[in-house]
């Protein structure tokens, strides 16, 4: 939808969370390795909120504690330790992570802190075994340059990543501690972004700076973007967990749509003198004979059915606020998160879901529901229903006041759903187990003198030095394999850099699309591959099949792969002999067409020699031998 974002007063700020590719974790010597094999053990614990140094309890932390969940943590004996399990004090901060934080800060023109104080940020959703995340403020007041103008960078913090969520049950959440403690940069921008396109460009530019260091992890889940969005007469909404850069634009557009829609609903409710009735009524007896599967299952499990009346809300609950999501979805999200129920029904969508028209009439009569009113009902265990409907009552009241400030979860379709209230500042307090870090002028001078080459500079160099075309150079500059490309190109000067680049950027991706696990392909495999090419052990046409061979047989050497695939390189004499045989086998076509038989013969030569001899050698040899026959 086309909006005048300037008129709407759109303000957007970003929080970028990027994992660092360091040798060790931030507060222990464990490797920064994510695993998917069977864990060696589990522990269980329950977390509770405590007061900050100011004597306050954070409302988001308090909300999590009310869910009364148990947390289960998986661990590995060889790649995790007691620090992750909160049974051993943290070690000193990893120097490599601090150096990277200073490097990124310098690239974003930021002012460094003289002394870095480690803080504890209260988090009791179970994602940290200790109930808090260790974080440290490194720099502030910087900026990045984009095609839309400069965007301020508020702060850069170095912190530990949280546990990896494995499973979310009704009364428990299971995590793995392999991700806990991986160094993470948190970069926060000023709300200088004024359009969805500008938001995407800002995130892209920050990502470019991070990748330029060569010290960040790549792949799904290694970078997470949170987006703070507000408009005039709206509210600040924090959208968590946008993993896809291309989704940022749509997230911003859809949040603007949501806030405009919620404001329109508010105005309509005020015109109607709408009212939220606080009373929760038990309607279990009224609907005890229903044929609705959802309601029957709840009653079968000794649950109850209860309802609330919303005066003046008829037609409003079913009104769309985002593509495919309605005000009723907003109510349902609150009930699900705060009550733990599966969902709710409302009269804007009934009769439906097995609830008959006759039952709706009885329900409206029992609830004293007028023509402009609406009823919401929930079926589940009594305590869950009470919590859910109280949450819906609160959200319904908010819909007559405006837009509540919330933290929301990014969905894959560009919409968002409720997570929790916006956290406050009451959840931060100093870390007492780790000493502060002094940032010296000598350290900063070293960082400034060793800054990495920026991608735009590298692009120009790749076109000039390696003779890549601009499109391939752009791909290579942004590639995870960029350092490997330079290493291989310098080491194997006999091989054209274009072949190395297309192998790393195109061939491997094509093989992955065929369904092979390219994660099994190592740098050592690629080193062997290009070494074999440079020594004429194989032809360039054999590259895709050799890569597949390494994936299928990760422990085999190149010579073994070539033997398995039947692709050992032939001598010039062997190639000449085979081509001569092919010409003799097709002599009638040669006599009839002369040099015009070249295409037919080339196809037959390649069918027999592909991967065993260089295509250029095959072509020149065939031309030479064919001319001899024709003459």
Swiss-Prot record:
One of its GO terms (biological process) is translation. It is an enzyme of class 6 (ligase). It catalyses: L-glutamyl-tRNA(Gln) + L-glutamine + ATP + H2O = L-glutaminyl-tRNA(Gln) + L-glutamate + ADP + phosphate + H(+). Coiled coil: none annotated. GO terms for molecular function: aminoacyl-tRNA ligase activity; ATP binding; glutaminyl-tRNA synthase (glutamine-hydrolyzing) activity. PROSITE patterns: GATB. One of its GO terms (cellular component) is cytoplasm. Its EC number is 6.3.5.-. Keywords: ATP-binding, Ligase, Nucleotide-binding, Protein biosynthesis. Pfam families: GAD, GatB_N, GatB_Yqey. Heterodimer of GatD and GatE. Allows the formation of correctly charged Gln-tRNA(Gln) through the transamidation of misacylated Glu-tRNA(Gln) in organisms which lack glutaminyl-tRNA synthetase. The reaction takes place in the presence of glutamine and ATP through an activated gamma-phospho-Glu-tRNA(Gln). The GatDE system is specific for glutamate and does not act on aspartate. Belongs to the GatB/GatE family. GatE subfamily. This is Glutamyl-tRNA(Gln) amidotransferase subunit E. It comes from Methanococcus maripaludis (strain DSM 14266 / JCM 13030 / NBRC 101832 / S2 / LL). The gene is gatE.
């Amino acid at each position: 939808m086309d909006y005048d974002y300037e008129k709407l007063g759109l303000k957007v700020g970003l929080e970028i969370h990027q994992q660092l590719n360091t040798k060790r974790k931030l507060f222990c010597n464990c490797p920064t390795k994510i695993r998917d094999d069977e864990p060696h053990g589990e522990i269980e614990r329950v977390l509770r909120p405590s007061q900050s140094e100011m004597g306050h309890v954070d409302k988001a932390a308090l909300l999590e504690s009310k869910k009364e969940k148990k947390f289960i943590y998986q661990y590995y004996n060889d790649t995790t330790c007691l620090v992750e399990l909160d049974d051993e004090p943290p070690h000193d901060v990893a120097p490599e992570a601090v150096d990277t934080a200073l490097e990124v800060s310098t690239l974003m023109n930021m002012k460094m802190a003289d002394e870095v104080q480690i803080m504890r940020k209260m988090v009791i959703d179970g994602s940290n075994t200790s109930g808090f995340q260790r974080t440290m403020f490194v720099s502030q007041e910087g900026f990045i340059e984009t095609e839309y103008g400069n965007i301020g960078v508020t702060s850069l913090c170095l912190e530990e990543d949280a546990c990896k969520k494995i499973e979310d049950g009704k009364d428990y959440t299971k995590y793995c501690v392999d991700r806990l403690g991986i160094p993470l940069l948190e970069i926060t921008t000023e709300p200088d972004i004024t359009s969805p396109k500008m938001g995407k460009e800002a995130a892209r530019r920050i990502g470019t700076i991070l990748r330029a260091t060569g010290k960040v992890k790549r792949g799904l889940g290694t970078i997470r973007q949170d987006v703070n969005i507000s408009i005039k007469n709206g509210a600040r909404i924090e959208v968590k967990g946008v993993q896809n850069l291309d989704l940022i634009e749509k997230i911003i557009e859809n949040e603007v749509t949501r806030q405009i829609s919620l404001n329109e609903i508010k105005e309509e409710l005020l015109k109607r003198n709408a009212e939220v009735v606080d009373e929760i009524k038990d309607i279990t007896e009224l609907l005890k004979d229903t044929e609705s599967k959802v309601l029957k299952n709840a009653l079968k499990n000794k649950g109850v059915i209860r309802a609330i009346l919303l005066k003046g809300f008829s037609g409003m609950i079913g009104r769309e606020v985002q593509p495919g999501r309605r005000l009723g979805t907003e109510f349902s999200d609150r009930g699900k998160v705060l009550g733990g129920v599966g969902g709710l029904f409302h009269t804007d969508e009934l009769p439906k879901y097995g609830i008959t028209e006759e039952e709706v009439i009885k329900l409206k009569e029992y609830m004293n529901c007028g023509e402009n009113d609406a009823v919401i009902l929930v079926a589940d265990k009594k305590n869950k229903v009470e919590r859910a409907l109280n949450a819906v009552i609160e959200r319904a009241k908010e819909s007559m006041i405006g837009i509540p400030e919330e933290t929301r979860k990014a969905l894959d379709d560009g919409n968002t759903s409720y997570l929790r209230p916006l956290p406050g500042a009451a959840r931060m307090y100093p870390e007492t187990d780790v000493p502060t870090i002094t940032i010296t002028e000598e350290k900063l001078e070293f960082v400034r003198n060793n800054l990495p080459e920026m991608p735009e500079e590298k692009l120009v160099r790749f076109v000039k030095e390696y003779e890549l075309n601009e499109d391939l150079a752009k791909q290579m500059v942004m590639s995870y394999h960029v350092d490997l490309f330079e290493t291989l190109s310098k080491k194997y000067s006999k091989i054209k850099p274009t072949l190395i680049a297309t192998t790393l950027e195109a061939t491997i991706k094509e093989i992955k699309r065929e369904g092979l696990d390219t994660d099994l392909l190592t740098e050592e495999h690629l080193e062997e591959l290009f070494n074999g090419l440079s020594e004429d052990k194989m032809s360039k046409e054999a590259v895709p099949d050799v890569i597949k061979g390494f994936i299928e047989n990760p422990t085999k050497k190149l010579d073994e792969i070539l033997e398995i695939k039947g692709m050992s390189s032939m001598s010039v004499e062997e190639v000449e002999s085979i081509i001569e045989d092919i010409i003799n086998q097709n002599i009638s076509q040669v006599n009839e067409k002369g040099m015009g038989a070249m295409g037919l013969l080339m196809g037959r030569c390649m069918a027999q020699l592909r991967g065993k001899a260089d295509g250029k050698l095959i072509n020149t040899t065939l031309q030479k031998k064919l001319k001899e026959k024709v003459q």
